[in-house]
Amino acid sequence: LISCGAVALMYLVAEKLFDERIGLIAMLLTAINPWQFMQSRWSLDCNLFPHVFLLAFYLLLLGLEKRRYLYLSMIFFGLTFYCYGIAAYSVTAFLFVFFIWCLWKHQLKFREGLLCAVLFIIVALPETIVLGINAIHLGKTIETPFFTMQYFPDSLRSADILLLNFSFAQLGRNAWALFSRVFLQLPDIFFNSIPAFGPLYHVSIPFVFVGIIVFTSRLFKEKKIEKQTQMLALWGFLVTGIWVGLITYEVNINRVNIIFYPLILLCAYGISLAVGKFKKLMPVIVIAYVVSSALFLVTYFTDYAEESKQYYNRDFLDAVVKADGMEEYDRLYITGNLGWQFNQSATEILTQYACKIDAQYYQSEDYAQRYHYIYPEKSGAELAEIVGDGLMVLYEEDLEYLQFPYEIIDEVGEYSLVVTQG
């Protein structure tokens, strides 16, 4: 739903920055964009980041004319911190540089900028404290009557930030990861892109470069300060994405997802420039995108959909739901084998999702007594004693490790619901 809303929002942003025609092009490009489909399918927390930033960005553009929108934008910029931790060193940098410009060019009064900073800090502060206590390894969680700022003793994410572990060699690797994934559109992980199409369609890249080069040139030549400030905001949006790619450890597409909306906007701008210069390009461009999007959609809803069942754990989710519905079994013993990986933490999280287990029930004794997570390969003959009269949810390869008589009472794809015999 949020991704669908972003399609309309892209029209509004492009229409505000450019004109209605570019707004329509940007909206259409977003609607058929491979990245838009892929990140919508993968409900990863960080994939909210570009959408919330885009909304805040649009409100920022409106706020340059009407201050109430500017103050509202600060709330949404603050909320980006709860979408993805990299907002701490990307959104903050974007706003700091942009407001320095606005104060310098008298687009904002100092008290207006100060109020914006206060609103932004108030909203972002709890998450900022969470990041801080984990960065310095404070060793304790901070609790208040309204929210808890959690300390995670096993958190390793600070190692992903170049600023905290700087080396020129790593900077070079980060730059190559950014350029290869975003601009060369080389293959990324399964969840992020289909190699034949990339995140933007390969046909888009020439228009992206045309858009970036011409837009940057016109930005520095623009004489009207109000227009230049708007243009600088979009340029800053793009630079923020590049900054994220350079500072974050060897980014993949989902880690640098903030860069794709400005790239789509500048691609639309590049297409408009190309068509304005060479009218006969219009049907060629339309055909290229129609063919590309048609091929993508066919692949996405057929081959990719079939292959993704394994990686999105469809059979596992269905098997767990079916087992949970068998109330005659008081205890469930669920394998950590997802087929493509063994991960007991992931299977527990997926079980909680599939069985709609809320936080209160998760913390209760009833949850601990009913749901158990096992490793059949290492349990051997002892598993029969552990399971007793409970119900096991096992991957097909787990069955060969059972060293006792058993009965398969049902099968769901590659998973079996199994009980002991005797």
Please state what every model-predicted region is.
Residues W35-C46:
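Short acidic/glycine- and proline-prone juxtamembrane loop motifs at membrane-interface regions
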Residues I75, F96, V118-I121, L265, ...:
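Signature aromatic-anchored transmembrane alpha helix within multi-pass, membrane-resident enzymes
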Residues L1-F18, L55, F207-F215, Y269:
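Transmembrane-helix motifs of polytopic, lipid-linked glycan transferases
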Residues M282-E327, I334-Y353, A359, S364-P376:
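Membrane-proximal, lumen/periplasm-facing interface regions of secretory-pathway glyco-
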Residues M38, S90-I213:
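Transmembrane-lumen/periplasm boundary regions of multi-pass, lipid-linked membrane glycan transferases
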Residues A26-A31, F77, F81:
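Short helix- or helix-capping micro-motifs
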Residues L17, F53-L72, T80:
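Membrane-interface transmembrane helices that cradle and orient dolichyl/undecaprenyl
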Residues Q39-S40, Y89, I205-P206, K227-G276:
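Hydrophobic/aromatic-rich transmembrane helices and adjacent perimembrane loops
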